[in-house]
Amino acid sequence: MPCPGAPCCSLVATGSRVPFSGLKEEEEEDGEDDEEEEEEGFFQKVLTPLLSWLLSRRLWLGPQCSKLPLPSCCRQPPPAGPPVEGDGWLKSFQRSRRMCFTSKSFRPEPDMLYAQKAKGWQLTQDSGGWEVQDQCTRIWSKENLLALNTHSRRQKGKRENKVCVSTWQKSRGDRTYSSMATTPSMTKILEGCMYRKLKC
């Protein structure tokens, strides 16, 4: 049985499945012919394997996907060790990318994301009562990338999380933001950064 891919590794929002492949960027840069190819490589090499792994750990369960038997290839954790400049999956895109992940039963694990140990994760708590793990501070202060922005604040008295992908192009200073799902009932958020040095 093949590993469940993007159609099955979906997010739950307001009781319905939201296919991961439905992600859209609100602002698209003009004059970039390789944008589509870059996005496709990013999804195939980074997000789809990560979502499949989270699904195997029962952290994300869609109503239909939760009933599927998981093949052995979906039970493998990410490779040990942090990513370094020049890693294959870092070469697949040129812009800084930031990803936020939410889970109802998140427990910090040393192998949750590739760069966790190297970037010095710290468990903090904001004014809204959310537990937040972030690894972004050292990255954006050193590399001048996208500043850390927590999406787990209280809004109108209700807890609200957004699962998102943010991109930022250093050479033009453009920032695009894409919201994939909003789930009010989730209680914890995991924020991670995947990055490479940019050529301007």
From Swiss-Prot:
Domain of life: Eukaryota
Statement: the UniProt record of this protein carries the keyword Cytoplasm: yes
Coiled coil regions, renumbered to chain: none
UniProt keyword Transmembrane, yes or no: no
GO cellular component, one term: cytoplasm
Name of the gene this protein is made from: ATXN8OS
Organism for this UniProt entry: Homo sapiens (Human)
Biased composition range(s): Acidic residues: 25-39
Keywords: Cytoplasm
Signal peptide positions on this chain: none
Record region (Disordered): 19-39
Tissue: Expressed in brain. Expressed in muscle tissues (at protein level).
Disulfide bonds: none
Location(s) in or outside the cell: Cytoplasm
Descriptive protein name: Putative protein ATXN8OS
